[in-house]
Amino acid sequence: MSSIVLPCPSCRIDNPTPAQQLLSRPRCQRCQQALTVNTPIETTREAIDGVIRSAPLPVLLVFYSQWSAPSTMAAPVLLQVAQRHAGRLLVLRINTDMNPDVMKRYGVTAMPALILFRGGSERKRLQGAHSAVEIEQLLSDGAASR
């Protein structure tokens, strides 16, 4: 079972949460505060495939690098996207500086790269810096593709 780590907004501890439980209103293991998925969540190469396959909602996988100015500029836009689509989209981030092999595995050649998955399959992708409007179009086009 693949899990992602959701930080508690109240007590700040990390809560490993199975991807299948994201829609069942998970709660913090310590304080029982509701855990919301309304920000991009950092992930690892070990968790990516399992989460993409088992998540009950579409997954936007964001490849970024700390040294990349376009990645830094995209961060606030991706936060807005995650907040706007909370409960309907899971936004995951993978740091390619710490996980360089994932770029090759997913055919990523520019930062940031966004790949939309639904039902475990890739639907659409964008590479390089893009506006909020272009990211929303990616989500809309990806929702329409079957």
Q: What is each residue range found by the language model?
A:
Residues 110, 115-146:
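Non-catalytic, surface beta->alpha helical segment in thiol-disulfide oxidoreductase systems
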